[in-house]
Amino acid sequence: MKSALHESRADTAEATSSASSAWKSVRALPARTLIFFIELYRTYVSPLRMPTCRFMPTCSEYAVESLRTHGVIKGLFLTVVRLAKCAPWHPGGWDPVPARRDRHAGGRRCCPANVDEQRST
């Protein structure tokens, strides 16, 4: 009896994992589509032009990395901000994609680790 119950739970966990994986693929589709067009630009248009990007990584590398790291909404926003910097008045230089923050890392904690310390201050 235990074996059948264990198998049932394993099947449910596998189905949930499969559904979660499928949902992640669907959510990544818009970013992948934009990355596809950026790769087309890098393959066919960029070689015809002189290298002019004043940043490291280049704007197209930055766009691909920001889309992969942050998804389509924030990645596209970061890319537009980066392209807006690409002007003669900006010095350029090293401008990496910001790291992805954990949703709960920057927020307030509901239960402080040491309540006594906070009460004494």
From Swiss-Prot:
One Pfam match: YidD
Membrane-protein topology: Peripheral membrane protein
Family: Belongs to the UPF0161 family.
Organism name: Rhodococcus jostii (strain RHA1)
Compartments, as annotated in UniProt: Cell membrane
The protein's name in its UniProt record: Putative membrane protein insertion efficiency factor
InterPro entries with a match to the protein in the record: Membr_insert_effic_factor_YidD
One Gene Ontology term, aspect cellular component: plasma membrane
UniProt superkingdom: Bacteria
Region Disordered: start-end pairs: 97-121
Keyword set, alphabetical order: Cell membrane, Membrane
Function: Could be involved in insertion of integral membrane proteins into the membrane.
HAMAP family: UPF0161_YidD
NCBIfam families in UniProt: membrane protein insertion efficiency factor YidD
